[in-house]
Amino acid sequence: MSKRTIQLNCDMGESFGVWTMGADEEVMPWIDMANIACGFHASDPHVMSRTIDLALEHEVMIGAHPSYPDLQGFGRRSLAMNEQEVSEIILYQVGALKALCESKNGQLSYVKPHGALYNDMMSDPSIFRAVVDAVSCFNLPLMVLASANNQDYLDIADRFDVPLLFEAFADRTYLANGKLTPRSQPNAVLSSEEAILNQVRQIARYGKVTSSDGFVIPIEADTLCVHGDNPNAVSLIARIRAALDE
């Protein structure tokens, strides 16, 4: 079976003040889509601006990466918020990044929520609806987790005329239900480069992923998430790019 054309996306701009997170300058040339943090889980106006410059330099698509307001927990903790509050934090963060992009004659191309907000969105229809409602104000696509059954998400998004981009993960393990293994559980992240590359090839060539307990799950992904915050990130992402181009 021929491989699917899949773009690489990566979380970027997650430094804050004098604290540095990730290897953005080294990773950016290898990716197609940069999910730029918007200040609520990481980043600040200067980091956001600098990361936009870097993406524009390398002709990488720019996406907003909003989260719950949780700097201390890096946006990985769920917060009890109603639909209006969720929509408001999305509007606030995406609006800020969009303004910075436009100040540089750049274009914001999509939205991908971060961490706990992403997970909650994929498990709670009310949160998903709140996110889609906010994203619809910008006329942008929303990036969501590719799963065996995407129809429920498509139905909600269609009501708001929001296109969906479906993503898979290169280095995260999957449960039998097609969801990501929570980071709180053991083996949530693949540590072997060969295991990561095998998963990438399976997704790209066959539209499938094997769960941690051996179930083969059909998924069709438009984009593949890679991570740039580990010591071997640059060399691994280069190998992933090569695997996609095989």
UniProtKB/Swiss-Prot annotation:
Keywords: ATP-binding, Hydrolase, Nucleotide-binding. It is an enzyme of class 3 (hydrolase). SUPFAM superfamilies: Glycoside hydrolase/deacetylase. GO terms for biological process: carbohydrate metabolic process. Its EC number is 3.5.2.9. It catalyses: 5-oxo-L-proline + ATP + 2 H2O = L-glutamate + ADP + phosphate + H(+). CDD domains: LamB_YcsF_like. InterPro entries: Glyco_hydro/deAcase_b/a-brl, LamB/YcsF/PxpA-like. The keyword Cell inner membrane does not apply. The keyword Transport does not apply. Forms a complex composed of PxpA, PxpB and PxpC. Belongs to the LamB/PxpA family. Catalyzes the cleavage of 5-oxoproline to form L-glutamate coupled to the hydrolysis of ATP to ADP and inorganic phosphate. This is 5-oxoprolinase subunit A. It comes from Vibrio cholerae serotype O1 (strain ATCC 39315 / El Tor Inaba N16961).
